[in-house]
Amino acid sequence: MFNNLTERLESAFKNLKGEARINDLNIANTVKDIRRALIDADVNYKIAKEFTDRVKDKAVGSKVINAISPGQLMVKIVKDELVELMGGEEAEFNTTGNPAVVLIAGLQGSGKTTFSGKLASYLKNQKGKSPLLVAADIYRPAAIDQLMVLGEQIGVDVYSERENKDAVSIAQNAIKEAKSKNKNIVIIDTAGRLAIDEAMMAEVANVKEAVKPNEILFVVDSMTGQDAVNTAKAFNERLDFTGVVLTKLDGDTRGGAALSIKYTVQKPIKFVSSGEKLDTLDVFYPERMAQRILGMGDITTLVEKAQAQFDEEQAKKLEKKIRKNQFDFQDFLDQLQQIKKMGNIKDLMGMIPGMGKAIKDVDISDDAFKGVEAIINSMTPYERANPDSITPGRRNRIAKGAGKQLADVNAFMKQFEQMRQMMKMMNKMPMGKMPGMRK
């Protein structure tokens, strides 16, 4: 996410490396490089200019204290301005009403229907809501089919009327259905187009007028940069939407949309989404995003994702096994599967400070774990529970069962043993426990 922008900003801050104090010359050079980085990231020139002017004004009036270098001070100023540019703080998401109504709008291909499913999953699993998805795209039967599949995957009902070509009546009937079935939030997936047109805008505006939604979310493909901002302006002028959703943040995103939309339409970014998995939806926090753009990672979100997936009782049992040096292949497989549930692996690693740059050109995907899973799944339950029982003969059988080379199995066994030895060493630390573990 934003790797190129991150590198360019880090390069700009190097202008201040070794400087004892901030002065007009090094500020000017740094600010010029920051402006270029923003423009190359597809941020509107006016926005980039105003942003860097504010950074310059703050830097000129700042004094460097002994504990902070000029470079660190500039990073702090830029981070604060990025946070402000993207909205300052988390935006409220209004789910009052019975039912509350959320209208989803955007161009075709923006990830609108997938987001509708993700939002329903988020509201059901994390907010305890009982959502109803509504297929109000009257032009594309495939959109109805897609929503039906998503609803089945997450256990959420989907309302549709395949023969009805009136989006307004579909939305109104869906709300009646929600009331009769005690659904407390209705998510209406409207039709998209390949480009903005009057008929599309009129239809969405009519649905809005008829159902009076609590929230109108404009879904935008973050990889489209300035085009996304221009589309947002057109939608906002007609719909006066309440918030923005940025999708496809796991792609080759330059950052222009994330950094420009709030300033341009004066509406907050409420959610960000990456990948096709239905649990890859996050509330948008400007400060956390600013940290990621500056290569500082996002430990807070990483911890929250882990807490949502890992069972506390299971964690206690695992802790005891690690203390007794009884960590086995089944434990390893269980942990691997929990980590995969947290989201895109490369995206998760990018939340670790400094890791985003290190893995930029490394091919990391969930597929990388498939070989390990195949090897463990080819073991008998006894072998999984007793790593020391795996003889050379058993390794041959496991390799054949997993469709792998013997060398692959040997390499994995070696890595697993190294991990067990590391755990053993940590258990021998003072106090006889691993750091952070309860005694």
Where are these regions (language model features)?
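Short, glycine/polar-rich helix-capping loops at beta-to-alpha or helix-loop-helix junctions
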Residues: 141-147, 228-231
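Long amphipathic alpha-helical segments used for membrane anchoring, targeting, substrate engagement
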Residues: 2-19, 288-439
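Short, small-residue-enriched loops and turns at beta-alpha junctions
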Residues: 109-110, 139-141, 165-167, 192-196, ...
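Primarily NTPase-proximal linker/entry elements flanking Walker-type ATP/GTP-binding cores
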Residues: 9-136, 143-164, 170-188
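Residue-level signature of catalytic and energy-coupling elements of molecular machines
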Residues: 16, 42-44, 78, 107, ...
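Short acidic alpha-helix initiation/capping motifs at coil-to-helix transition points
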Residues: 6-8, 25-35, 280-281, 387-393
